[in-house]
């Protein structure tokens, strides 16, 4: 190949790489002029933070957030085809079997101050890694493993003893065991040099749970280990307990239990285990005292003899792509942030619920802003902070809150009613309503968009053929949906009332007619019902749209709605 052809090939490769980098960088849909201006402002802000950090010893933002913003600036420069001049640093990385002894759970400490408070006055304390796995009870009788119980609700769990022979880390027989031996511990996925600081959760717990709950034998069972963290009614001394556990085939307790005197000791091990290679995934540390009550006193609530100090929840920085507003069944409007997808622990985040319109206005967020998000309880995405705001503030017009309340949008039209109407249908078919199986938002949306449903009860008049006419449903599924619609007819009057939107938590009569006869004063005589609540009930019962639905249900023969009842 001659030199001229090689130059052409090189230019083509460079062009392709540049194009690919720009495509992967998720470039904002801005004009070049705006991109240049926003980039200049972000660069200026980063310089200010950098000066504060190096010259004043101040950290206005966390190091990892700073690094992520530097990376954002780097990608924006690629979008404009500019050479990179940023100094990127790598980012540091429900069962039926009774438990012999209840699983107590752990109280989670918020910070080191809470740890100091808990440690005050206690002695003989030990710290262990808080392993991210599945809690179990092992029961040995005459040395033979008889039960492997899931934690369940702490009192009862499932027996996974059939999986135990395939988990080599769990001894099937212990010659030196006492006549009855009960151990509690964590079944985990064995890892090779796992560093929590770099790799996070690695979806380990879900993998373990899946392998244990499968009816068939999973190959993953052979890769599971166990860490014993409690021996109810066992030796008082942790040293003796660890020695005996090691002799019985459970060596990890001895290897990963360290005596501590102060919170700084705990913090040292917490940091060390967070960064060093370990054979398991962790999400913090557990601090235990040697002196614990007898097993018969343990309850399915956190005991006061052990606590957890988890690692800080990981944060990610992302960009606001758009802002949507949803209207709930009762007319409540919620602001939803659509963000550039980011992965936190094992979960991809694309949307963040930030609450009411008023809350959204307090945040002062528009598309293009850079925010940090983390996972709150139960893995729910949470907006933590607005890190950087774009200079050009796009005007966002939310829905008019005055147009929506508890008695609006029982029908699809007008157009702005569709979100609340869809929420009403989802409630009606859900567990709080008529409890229809496999009938949810997706189905309702399709039926609405194909013109089969315009009112809250139109589905009662649909035939199998009409349902099957919706693209993607088909005859078989249509018949199952139709069966659910027909089964709903047999639901009791109280369920129908809740499905329609009648206020919850109120004792109900057995007929629509008798409910409508009550005055506001009579409703107020009932326990827990004040003036406001009584008026809400009265307005619902006498609303024209609601009465029309009651009349229709009477015609359909639904129990409780006939005037004679």
From Swiss-Prot:
Function noted in UniProt: Catalyzes the formation of phosphodiester linkages between 5'-phosphoryl and 3'-hydroxyl groups in double-stranded DNA using NAD as a coenzyme and as the energy source for the reaction.
Species for this entry: Yersinia enterocolitica serotype O:8 / biotype 1B (strain NCTC 13174 / 8081)
NCBIfam families: PRK08097.1
Record SMART domains: LIGANc (SM00532)
Family, similarity comment: Belongs to the NAD-dependent DNA ligase family. LigB subfamily.
Keywords, in A-Z order: DNA damage, DNA repair, DNA replication, Ligase, NAD
Active-site residues, as the UniProt record annotates them: 130 (n6-amp-lysine intermediate)
InterPro entries xref list: DNA_ligase_B (IPR020923), DNAligase_adenylation (IPR013839), DNAligase_N (IPR013840), NA-bd_OB-fold (IPR012340), NAD_dep_DNA_ligaseB (IPR050326), NAD_DNA_ligase_OB (IPR004150), RuvA_2-like (IPR010994)
One Gene Ontology molecular-function label: DNA ligase (NAD+) activity
GO terms (BP aspect): DNA repair; DNA replication
Enzyme Commission number: 6.5.1.2
HAMAP family, per database record: DNA_ligase_B (MF_01587)
Name of the protein described by the UniProt record: DNA ligase B
Catalytic activity: NAD(+) + (deoxyribonucleotide)n-3'-hydroxyl + 5'-phospho-(deoxyribonucleotide)m = (deoxyribonucleotide)n+m + AMP + beta-nicotinamide D-nucleotide
